[in-house]
Amino acid sequence: LLFIFNTVAFATNPPEGFTSLFNGKDLTGWWGLKTEDPSKWLSLPQEKFKAKWEASQKDIHKHWRVKNGILINDGHGLFLSTEKNYGDFELMLEYKTVAGADSGIYLRGVPQVQIWDTSKEGGKWKLGADKGSGGLWNNGPSGTRGRDPLLYADKPFGEWNHFHISMTGNLVSVRLNEKLVVHRA
């Protein structure tokens, strides 16, 4: 999983049957990636992989931090990615955006579940922020199934939002604040 938050996320006790990806203390279990297929990293010769991994650690420790159990990004640097790869999965997380946010969660590299500052003042309406967060952005042009959310489900700006994302094969469903915004796209 690849996180590109210009926002924050925090660790809590996971529901039964789920495993926490974030320990609430530090960046253990994470590395930094650009928008790229993580399998390309894994196919590198060991010495090249090690050098790239070490560089990614320097970058994420520069741009990501943990404060009071909350994972915070400064809006710069590499995207945060789990060191472990996942097949079919369900992911639950909470996030809060910052002014002007244009962020998201890459699932196995593509697609990206979009996170916006959906306020008009955020300046992203011409890009689709007026439709709300949760659509599968960077997954095709406007009109592509799942690109735009089925409905607007974001909480008012500055409040915490909750995602429940499931990916089975290449099909993604997204619930934002308990409302279905993408169904098997």
What residue spans do the PLM features occupy?
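Carbohydrate-interacting regions of secretory-pathway proteins
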Residues: 10-185
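Bacterial N-terminal signal peptides
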Residues: 1-6
